[in-house]
């Protein structure tokens, strides 16, 4: 009988010690707000066309990391919904096929890509790494090749 009470006492002691450790750990945390830097806030794509709508249906965010070798042109393509490109490293030159507009985006910069306009990106002398976030919906591809072109990725 004494053994039963001793085991219960040990269990209670361990539970109390665990709780005390959790409380001490939380007390050691410094609570503070982070510093915000808006990288991109826009209602239009880089080529000047306004975003008109989001796709209907269940929203689905998709973020990809795209690595493109030096001196590479991606195939011509479109996107069916808004997305944001952030250049982690390298340089990306965007080309709008219909208008001929171009935009050079450097490491640390973000840009809103065009929706339904045929475009592509080209890299410079070094590998370019992009972080791309799409505001889409399930079942709809994030990139659609232009007629006669291969997939962007």
Kindly give the residue locations of the regions a language model identified.
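Short histidine-centered beta-strand/loop micro-motifs
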Residues: 74-79, 96, 103, 121-123
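Short acidic-glycine-tyrosine-enriched beta hairpin
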Residues: 68, 99-116
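Histidine-centered metal-chelating micro-motifs
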Residues: 73-75, 110-121
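A short beta-loop-beta micro-motif enriched in histidine and acidic residues
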Residues: 56-59, 71-84
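A short, N-terminal "cap"/entry segment at the start of jelly-roll beta-barrel domains
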Residues: 2-7, 17-60, 104, 146-153
